[in-house]
Amino acid sequence: MNMLTYDQLGLSSDAINGLEPTAAAASAGAVASAAAALPAGAVSKPVFHADGSETVSVHTGGLTFNLTFDAAAAAAPESFRAGVELAAAILSSAITDKATVNLAIDYAGTGGGAGANISNGLLVNYTQLKADLVDHAAAGDTVFDHLKAGATIQGHAMVAVSNAEAKVLGLIAPNDTTTQDGFATFNTDIPTQ
């Protein structure tokens, strides 16, 4: 596993103020400080929409993330938005593929449930997907060599691939800004204290 250093992310360890992955907890102020320490221009000025949502672009490396915060997320504490932007910046620095990923960020109660789903994507032939993964692997990376041989996986010839993954693999236009490539719902029903 490759670990990014603070210098590679354009951050100082002083600005992070305890955000190391091994830290038990990070304060809201530390998240805001870390996001503020992002390189100049890493986060665009917000574009405000009539429905109360707002969109920012985050770019520190290969990927560009267009984050559309719903009205509740836009009104959430600054530390929440700063944390999401910081996470996007870290991923942007770590993933070198040139693509634009459009994510909807929701801040709402879910009634106590949890869920995961692919919001938008396509079905891809398993043989093609395996070849694309091998072709896009970093030099010397053999992890995809261990995928099941043959034309099917668990009896299926087609595999669901999210738009974000399809963009990075070149299966759809990598910089299409009209697609919703994914979403993240942050559950406000879970107590934070």
Can you annotate each of these PLM segments?
Residues M1-Q193:
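Extracellular zinc-dependent metalloprotease catalytic-domain scaffold
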